[in-house]
Amino acid sequence: MKMIEAVIRPFKLDEVREALTGAGVTAMTVSEVLGAGPRSARKESYRGLEYTRLMPGIKLEVAVPDGRVDHVVRIITGAARTGRPGAGMIFVSMLDDATRVRTGEHGEAVL
């Protein structure tokens, strides 16, 4: 199993969610986040203090079986693409286990 974490532009959320749902991916966690990438990390100052301006984003977390990772990443990439810097990033990491709290079942069966 893998955990796919995608940080995308907020205005792309509906498009990405619809694309994932259309592909049968209905379970996901969505969070509002702030971040800065190498191109969007603008230094600003306020009252003599320097800080990096953080841009709003949406973080999607989706757990998928190993065999679906490439397909889901392609779906997110296609739906989230803006053609401009700051469109987002996708991270894929190992997921050792998952447990459904209601039933106690675990493993790929809960995905």
Q: Where do the language-model regions lie?
A:
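Positively charged, small/polar-rich N-terminal and surface patches that mediate targeting and assembly
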Residues: 1-111
